[in-house]
A protein has these predicted regions:
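Helix-rich effector regions associated with P-loop NTPase G domains
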Residues: 1-19, 38, 59, 70, ...
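Structural detector for short beta-strands of small beta-barrel domains
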Residues: 37-48
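Short aromatic-glycine-enriched beta-strand elements
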Residues: 50-54
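Phosphate-binding glycine-rich loops and their immediate beta-loop-alpha structural context
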Residues: 116-123, 129-182, 189
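Canonical P-loop GTPase G-domain recognition
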Residues: 155, 165-220
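A conserved segment at the C-terminal end of the G1
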Residues: 222-238
Length: 365
């Protein structure tokens, strides 16, 4: 029976086997023991309008044993799929959300509205960024996705889908090279969800009960890849428009999906998400620096440390642009992201000042 956690550093022997199969590890066990809380820890598998589906152990044969899954209210709890939470002893509510080790989030509000964070997936180890080979390479979108992925604390992996629809190997190489150019150092996989090409390589990222998240625009083939990874029909699929290769949302809710075991290791977990149209920045971390390592490395050679890479003398970045070693569009993209991040920081600071003045801001206890 779950009770008050013990203080101190946990060992492997302290980790419950059922929770371990959901991704629980020694780090989580140590955190749990240090909380000294009553209740029972579990993982959020799905959110539905104020309700959380929480798993205590993974599904067996596609269904849960009685008592292994509960549906509880999110009263006063800011939760996301993938979160580890503590459910009250009476199984009525979520009492506490354990501190996240990683979180993929973006700005949720539209222009003109107050900025709010939207956590898409929590406690993930890897983020699969899906782009369809049948569509023209969207370098600017990928750059934004990489910033968010690096800021999340997870490892970004670029997945190029719908290989089965490409009959020109040279065009595949060209489109792959275009996206690879703005993803230095990032793992890249070319796959066909329909035929299964390259899918086993993706499954290995989740081996050992790790959690991967799948993100991309509508129509890139997420649902087909999910079904192939899982080995069954988890999501419905839909055709895309031939004119612009845009698709319809076939995934309507974020959910945690079990991946089967394979010869290279234990099973893992996949967080499937609806198609993301707008990729807006939220957190201010090292994401831009890590997504634009090529630009920042050039910046280290500039004459002035505070060089803006405009028309300053001795600017190594502008020199690289003039020499054709750096795409001017990539530099402008980075500048836009830096400006967007700065504006967001200013907006957040201004809002906190107003909330402090009006007494609305939550105080730490």
């Amino acid at each position: 029976m779950w009770g008050i956690g013990r203080r101190g550093k946990a060992t492997v022997g302290d980790v419950d086997d059922a929770l371990r199969a959901l991704g629980w590890n020694v780090t989580w066990e140590t955190t749990w023991q240090g909380l000294a809380r009553t209740g029972r820890p579990g993982r959020v598998a799905r959110l539905d309008r104020g309700w959380s589906t929480v798993w205590y152990r993974p599904a067996h044969g596609g269904s849960h044993a009685e008592g292994d899954v509960v549906r509880v209210r999110n009263i006063g709890a800011d939760v996301a799929v993938g979160d580890w939470v503590v459910v009250s002893d009476d199984v009525e509510r979520i009492e506490f959300v354990l501190p996240r080790q990683s979180a993929f989030m973006r700005r949720a509000s539209f222009e003109g509205q107050r900025a709010e964070a939207h956590v898409i997936a929590a406690n993930i180890d890897v983020v699969f960024l899906l782009h369809a080979l049948v569509a023209p390479p969207n370098q600017r979108r990928l750059e934004r996705e990489l910033v968010l992925a690096f800021d999340s604390g997870a490892q970004p992996v670029l997945v190029l889908s719908k290989l089965d629809l490409m009959d020109n190997a040279n065009e595949v190489e060209r489109r792959m090279a275009a996206l690879e150019a703005v993803a230095p150092g990032v793992d890249i996989h070319v796959v066909s969800g329909l035929r299964g090409d390259g899918v086993d390589a993706l499954r290995r990222y989740a081996a050992g009960y790790r959690t991967v998240a799948l993100l991309g625009a509508s129509g890139v083939g997420k649902s087909t890849i999910v079904n192939t990874l899982v080995g069954g029909q988890v999501q419905s699929t839909a055709a895309v428009r031939e004119g612009d290769q845009r698709g319809r949302h076939t995934t309507t809710a974020v959910q945690l999906v079990a991946l089967p075991s394979d010869p290279v290791g234990a099973a893992g977990w996949l967080i499937d998400t609806p198609g993301v149209r707008a990729v807006s920045l939220w957190s201010s971390g090292t994401g831009i620096e890590r997504a634009f390592t090529d630009v920042f490395e050039l910046g280290e050679k500039c004459r002035f440390r505070d060089c803006k890479h405009d028309d300053e003398p001795g600017c190594a970045v502008q020199a690289a642009v003039q020499a054709g070693d750096l795409d001017a569009r990539r530099l402008e993209s980075m500048k836009r992201l830096v400006a967007e991040e700065a504006a967001l920081e200013d907006e957040q600071k201004a809002r906190l000042k107003v909330e402090d003045r009006r007494g609305f801001r939550k105080r730490k206890t």
